[in-house]
Amino acid sequence: MKLLMLARNPNLYSHRRLVEAAEARGHELDIYDTLKMYMNITSHRPEVRYQGRVLSGYDAIIPRIGASITGYGMAVVRQFEMMGVWALNESVAIGRSRDKLRSLQLLSRAGLGLPVTAFAHDTSMTDDVLDIAGGEPVVIKLLEGTQGVGVVLAETRRSAKSVIEAFRGAKVDILVQEFIKEAGGADIRTIVVGGKVVAAMKRQGAEGDFRSNLHRGGSASKIKLTPEERSTAVRAAKVMGLNVAGVDMLRGNHGPLIMEVNSSPGLEGIEASTGVDVADKIIDFVEKTAVAGKTRTRGTG
């Protein structure tokens, strides 16, 4: 198969591993910078171009779209969909998962476990917003934050109000969530591929940090999921419409609580901690599933 990865940095561990896995299976996997692609939007022969030539003849694309370029990245994926090229994760699904508020609303509608979450624009009702989230301590998150950046634990009502006012003063949108104390600064990252959990790890926050992101100095170890956790991860990926997803959960007193669903999960931490060749499982899924013209959206979403 001839495959194309949409990614800004070909040297990232995850991207190198996907190339290795593809080549080991006899496939060709090119990596081109998403931001350097451009489009010919026409009715009869839509094109994506790169350095003056048309990108054609690909059996499938593997989008690895960074959060900072979501809008343009989705447009490029959508253009390939209009050309009938199969996408590992489709543009509409990527958009759902990147919009934190929308993803929480969709997961909530599906009846999946979530931390109690409040969202408001006006700061005049901050006390009620904090009460909705169960009262202090609360976790305050930037809607656009990634890798633990823009996430604050406010342990008192006064500090919570100060943080909310500061964020709103900067004209950024935030979520206020209940603090899940029983999680103990740890979360679970699962990788779902084609409707199956292929790997799972526990991430423990660094000493004194409630955030468990490995980018923030956390540690990782292999973990055995409960049947409910496994089912929750699979259902979350399905709600988003993602063929490949990183689903982050907390272990609450009443079951798993979804924190985030990621459309471009990193592979380094989870492959190292579990020993699972996640990259190979992703390429195996592409190999078995990619069919030209099979894209569900065809660029309509």
From Swiss-Prot:
<dbReference type="Pfam" id="PF18030">
    <property type="entry name" value="Rimk_N"/>
</dbReference>
<keyword id="KW-0464">Manganese</keyword>
<dbReference type="GO" id="GO:0005737">
    <property type="term" value="C:cytoplasm"/>
</dbReference>
<dbReference type="InterPro" id="IPR023533">
    <property type="entry name" value="RimK"/>
</dbReference>
<feature type="binding site">
    <location>
        <position position="248"/>
    </location>
    <ligand>
        <name>Mg(2+) 1</name>
    </ligand>
</feature>
<feature type="binding site">
    <location>
        <position position="260"/>
    </location>
    <ligand>
        <name>Mn(2+) 1</name>
    </ligand>
</feature>
<feature type="binding site">
    <location>
        <begin position="178"/>
        <end position="179"/>
    </location>
    <ligand>
        <name>ATP</name>
    </ligand>
</feature>
<dbReference type="GO" id="GO:0009432">
    <property type="term" value="P:SOS response"/>
</dbReference>
<keyword id="KW-0547">Nucleotide-binding</keyword>
<dbReference type="GO" id="GO:0036211">
    <property type="term" value="P:protein modification process"/>
</dbReference>
<feature type="binding site">
    <location>
        <position position="141"/>
    </location>
    <ligand>
        <name>ATP</name>
    </ligand>
</feature>
<feature type="binding site">
    <location>
        <position position="248"/>
    </location>
    <ligand>
        <name>Mn(2+) 1</name>
    </ligand>
</feature>
<keyword id="KW-0460">Magnesium</keyword>
<feature type="binding site">
    <location>
        <position position="187"/>
    </location>
    <ligand>
        <name>ATP</name>
    </ligand>
</feature>
<dbReference type="GO" id="GO:0005524">
    <property type="term" value="F:ATP binding"/>
</dbReference>
<dbReference type="InterPro" id="IPR011761">
    <property type="entry name" value="ATP-grasp"/>
</dbReference>
<keyword id="KW-0648">Protein biosynthesis</keyword>
<feature type="binding site">
    <location>
        <position position="260"/>
    </location>
    <ligand>
        <name>Mn(2+) 2</name>
    </ligand>
</feature>
<dbReference type="InterPro" id="IPR013815">
    <property type="entry name" value="ATP_grasp_subdomain_1"/>
</dbReference>
<dbReference type="GO" id="GO:0018169">
    <property type="term" value="F:ribosomal S6-glutamic acid ligase activity"/>
</dbReference>
<feature type="binding site">
    <location>
        <begin position="211"/>
        <end position="213"/>
    </location>
    <ligand>
        <name>ATP</name>
    </ligand>
</feature>
<feature type="binding site">
    <location>
        <position position="262"/>
    </location>
    <ligand>
        <name>Mg(2+) 2</name>
    </ligand>
</feature>
<dbReference type="InterPro" id="IPR004666">
    <property type="entry name" value="Rp_bS6_RimK/Lys_biosynth_LsyX"/>
</dbReference>
<feature type="binding site">
    <location>
        <position position="262"/>
    </location>
    <ligand>
        <name>Mn(2+) 2</name>
    </ligand>
</feature>
<keyword id="KW-0436">Ligase</keyword>
<feature type="domain" description="ATP-grasp">
    <location>
        <begin position="104"/>
        <end position="287"/>
    </location>
</feature>
<dbReference type="InterPro" id="IPR013651">
    <property type="entry name" value="ATP-grasp_RimK-type"/>
</dbReference>
<dbReference type="GO" id="GO:0006412">
    <property type="term" value="P:translation"/>
</dbReference>
<protein>
    <recommendedName>
        <fullName>Probable alpha-L-glutamate ligase</fullName>
        <ecNumber>6.3.2.-</ecNumber>
    </recommendedName>
</protein>
<dbReference type="GO" id="GO:0046872">
    <property type="term" value="F:metal ion binding"/>
</dbReference>
<feature type="binding site">
    <location>
        <position position="260"/>
    </location>
    <ligand>
        <name>Mg(2+) 1</name>
    </ligand>
</feature>
<feature type="binding site">
    <location>
        <position position="260"/>
    </location>
    <ligand>
        <name>Mg(2+) 2</name>
    </ligand>
</feature>
<comment type="similarity">
    <text>Belongs to the RimK family.</text>
</comment>
<keyword id="KW-0479">Metal-binding</keyword>
<dbReference type="InterPro" id="IPR041107">
    <property type="entry name" value="Rimk_N"/>
</dbReference>
<dbReference type="Pfam" id="PF08443">
    <property type="entry name" value="RimK"/>
</dbReference>
<keyword id="KW-0067">ATP-binding</keyword>
